[in-house]
């Protein structure tokens, strides 16, 4: 993947400005509420029976934060994202058996949450760079499924 200097700067700036403890739980909660079939991977996380239960679930919040910290790996390894996610790809494909389509769903939910937080600063150019980055990460996470 080729990254322009502008794309790199935008991605680094977005992640530097995110409150992971706010954005991570909101993005994962949104995914589990909007796409309820994704809840099947979180059976050990307790009550997921209602949107309020999901949004108030501390295990969901903690995992959402963990996901955002996992994206730091991509930000720090933009020239080698596929290799940076090999371990996580193996974990999600071989151990957790996560449907790789769910990575895209979560990326879409993250985009919505980040856009809502950034407001007018989430310009089309910003969205372009952000979604390009997430698409590369999603592809890297799914590479072990092939």
Curated annotation (Swiss-Prot):
Heme b binds at residues 63, 92. GO terms for molecular function: haptoglobin binding; heme binding; metal ion binding; organic acid binding; oxygen binding; oxygen carrier activity; peroxidase activity. GO terms for cellular component: blood microparticle; haptoglobin-hemoglobin complex; hemoglobin complex. Red blood cells. Keywords: Heme, Iron, Metal-binding, Oxygen transport, Transport. One of its GO terms (biological process) is hydrogen peroxide catabolic process. The keyword Protease does not apply. Signal peptide: none annotated. Residues 2-146 form the Globin domain. Hb1 is a heterotetramer of two alpha-1 chains and two beta-1 chains; Hb2 is a heterotetramer of two alpha-2 chains and two beta-1 chains. Hb1 and Hb2 display a low, effector-enhanced Bohr effect and no Root effect. Involved in oxygen transport from gills to the various peripheral tissues. PANTHER family: HEMOGLOBIN FAMILY MEMBER, HEMOGLOBIN SUBUNIT EPSILON. Belongs to the globin family. This is Hemoglobin subunit beta-1. The gene is hbb1.
């Amino acid at each position: 993947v080729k990254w322009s200097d502008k794309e790199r700067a935008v991605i680094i700036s977005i992640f530097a400005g995110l409150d992971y403890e706010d954005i991570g739980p909101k993005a994962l909660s949104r995914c589990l509420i909007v796409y309820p079939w994704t809840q099947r991977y979180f059976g050990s996380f307790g009550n997921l029976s209602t949107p309020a239960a999901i949004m108030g679930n501390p295990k969901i919040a903690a995992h959402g934060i963990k996901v955002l910290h996992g994206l730091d790996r991509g930000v720090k390894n933009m020239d080698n994202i596929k290799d940076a996610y090999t371990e996580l790809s193996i974990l999600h494909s071989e151990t957790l058996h996560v449907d790789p389509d769910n990575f895209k769903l979560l990326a879409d939910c993250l985009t919505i949450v980040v856009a809502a937080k950034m407001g007018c600063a989430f310009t089309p150019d910003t969205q372009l760079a952000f979604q390009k980055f997430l698409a590369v990460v999603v592809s890297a996470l799914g590479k072990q499924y092939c």
